[in-house]
Amino acid sequence: MEISGKTRLFGLIGSPVEHSKSPAMYNYCFDKWKLDYKYLAFDVDKNQTADAIQAFRTFQMKGANITMPCKQEVLKYLDEISPAARLVGACNTIVNHDGVLTGYITDGEGYIENLRHEGVEVKGKKITLLGAGGVSSAIQAQALLDGAREIAVFNKKDAFWEQAVAKAAEYQKAFPSQKITVYDMDDTEKLAAEIRTSDILSNATRVGMHPLENISIITDHSLFRKELVVTDVVYEPEKTKLLQDAEAAGCKTVGGLGMLIY
């Protein structure tokens, strides 16, 4: 559609954004469904976040996606924050509700909705989650909000380790009747034990994504059983090596593409 005097604006806020595919994707959808919206990418550094949100208000933008380095900083300038975004301490989406700017973290919601669409509920379930980065943290928060019984997080003792342990402690305090624990990914015996008692196994690492598409983060196929749901946040390739191996063992599998859509 052509730009009119009523065209409303959406955008991507962060830096760098010049290689983002979001403008092409959103503008294609707006045109396809004849919506009078346009989506632009705005290169905004962390110290420009306040000015960017003021501009958002001034121009009455409908919404925005937030990427690094603004995902934490932006929370200071919003009117409302979703429970999950508050827990995670980061925001990747802003929606303008009649002048009230609300921040959301959609990774966890997308993950849960993707599972639900495939007939899998997390309430009362135990999840083993591989990786402790930003996506993992969002999944942890949303799973706890949706009633997961227990979450076992595995991560290498790298630069993210202390942050992962601290965040899990925050979540545990917020959800005392549920359990969340962080373990060393290199402790293969503990990893095997947790997977064997889990309902859902989720990969929230980059393993399986190019150039690691021929690698699975789980090499012991005996850990796959028919009752185990195996999921992956990686969506390219749509069916990772982990999912291929799990499917061959009879597991129900859920890829990451649906998470992106939801």
Question: What is each of the regions a protein language model found here?
Answer:
Residues S177-G255:
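Rossmann-like adenosine-cofactor binding region
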Residues G14, G103-G108, G124-L145, N155:
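Glycine-rich adenosine-cofactor-binding loop
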Residues E2-E118:
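Phosphate/diphosphate ligand-binding glycine-rich loop within oxidoreductases
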Residues A148-F175:
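NAD(P)-binding Rossmann-fold cofactor-contacting core
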Residues L9, K38, K126, R149-A152:
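Residues at the starts of beta-strands that form the adenosine-phosphate
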Residues E113, H117, Y235-E236, C251-Y262:
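Active-site capping/gating segments
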Residues L145-E150, A249-K252:
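Conserved S-adenosyl-L-methionine
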Residues I3-S4, V122-K123, L145, I218-E227:
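Short, conserved loop/helix-junction motifs that constitute active-site signature segments
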